[in-house]
């Protein structure tokens, strides 16, 4: 049985590339015991000095909703009753991330015409850490790393990500965070397109992991190359 995370990944594949993308993924999964290759694009962007909403002629998205910034287990406990158990990372996992210094942004929208809130999605960020394909390392750059994002299926495509992004950017400005970064699978076309166009990220490198004969032989992109790509991006954006 597929895990919730795999089901979500298949849904993203279908949205971005249709049935051929799903079939390609399935073939690779069948061949994975012999040869398995994973890749993640490394994406990053510099935080603008001011919100796009401050620009002349730019109005706030009309989607009705709110985004809460959660930095402690106590803050999570206050709203956990509205979070469904079906999300990819359950409450216990979210608490562990908070204990590690992560920040979680929760998106809600009004329930029908009443005043109750209903859960839309969440994203997990962490400062000064970079993680890709099972490896993780602290970095000396002033970056906010996006660990994971999930929007419930019934709310996708309704611009709730705009509410989340605005809240996240305001948090970064208040806390002196200069850069955002994350990773996206190359075959996740819908997320990649959104990141590069709507969110104005740049692809600054690609991390690869190749496993042969059930992990007997493994090659991974060296950390030095990943750090160099991040450092070059920071240097160029700082000069600019």
PLM region spans:
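Short His-Asn-centered micro-motif
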Residues: 147-149, 182-185
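Acyl-donor-binding surface of acyltransferase catalytic domains
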Residues: 1-74, 80-81, 89-92
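Conserved GNAT acetyl-CoA-binding A-motif
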Residues: 172-184
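Conserved acetyl-CoA-binding loop-helix of GNAT-fold acetyltransferases
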Residues: 148-151, 157-170
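Conserved active-site alpha-helix within GNAT-family acetyltransferase domains
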Residues: 186-207
């Amino acid at each position: 049985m597929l895990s919730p995370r795999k089901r979500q990944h298949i849904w993203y594949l279908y949205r971005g590339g249709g049935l051929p993308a799903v079939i390609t993924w399935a073939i690779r999964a069948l061949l994975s015991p012999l040869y398995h290759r994973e890749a993640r694009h490394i994406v990053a962007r510099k935080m603008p000095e001011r919100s796009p909403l401050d620009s002349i002629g730019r109005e706030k998205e009309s989607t009705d909703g709110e985004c809460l910034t959660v930095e402690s287990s106590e803050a999570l406990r206050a709203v956990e009753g509205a979070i469904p158990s079906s999300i990819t990372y359950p409450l216990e996992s979210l608490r562990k991330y908070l204990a590690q210094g992560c920040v979680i942004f929760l998106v809600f929208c009004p329930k029908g015409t009443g005043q109750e809130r209903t859960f839309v999605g969440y994203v997990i960020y962490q400062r000064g850490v970079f993680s890709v394909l099972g490896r993780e390392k602290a970095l000396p750059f002033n970056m906010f790393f996006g660990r994971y994002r999930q929007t419930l299926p019934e709310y996708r495509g309704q611009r709730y990500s705009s509410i989340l992004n605005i809240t996240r950017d305001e948090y970064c400005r208040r806390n002196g965070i200069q850069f955002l970064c994350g990773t996206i699978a190359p075959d996740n076309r819908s997320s990649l397109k959104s990141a590069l166009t709507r969110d104005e990220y740049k692809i600054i490198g690609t991390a690869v992991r190749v496993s042969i004969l059930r992990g007997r032989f493994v090659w991974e992109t060296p950390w030095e190359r990943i750090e160099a790509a991040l450092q070059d991006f920071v240097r160029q954006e700082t000069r600019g």
